[in-house]
């Protein structure tokens, strides 16, 4: 299985793991724990205290408490894979809680997905300096 990392997923609305009666229906990998039906901020804090994850995955960050929990996770040595609704770097940098993170370069990559008229998805990747990386 290659690199073995402890991964935890906070799946507030069962949109990532699609858990049913506590069992993930999507393949989350052999070393992944899923916290289902728990708020993002609370879930991240519980996982940091009890599971010592190397990576925490969470979707749709938006509330101030989410950003505080991400900052705690980063300060505790976990990496965070998170999603945020934004169409481009300008829109992303205008989000209230992200501005200071972007200034501190807490993120290594920013990936923007765009659906084209033919149904295909176009991807744009930026580095921590907010410079576009060609894929």
Placement of each model-derived feature along the sequence:
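P-loop NTPase switch/communication element
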Residues: 1-47
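Structural signal for conserved beta-strand scaffold positions within catalytic alpha/beta enzyme cores
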Residues: 9, 33-36, 82, 112, ...
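Switch/connector loops and helix/strand junctions flanking conserved nucleotide-binding motifs
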Residues: 16-19, 90-92, 119-122
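Short, low-complexity, polar/charged sequence segments that are solvent-exposed and flexible
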Residues: 26-29, 100-102, 129-133
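Conserved P-loop NTPase nucleotide-binding/switch module
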Residues: 51-111, 115
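Conserved P-loop NTPase
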Residues: 108-135
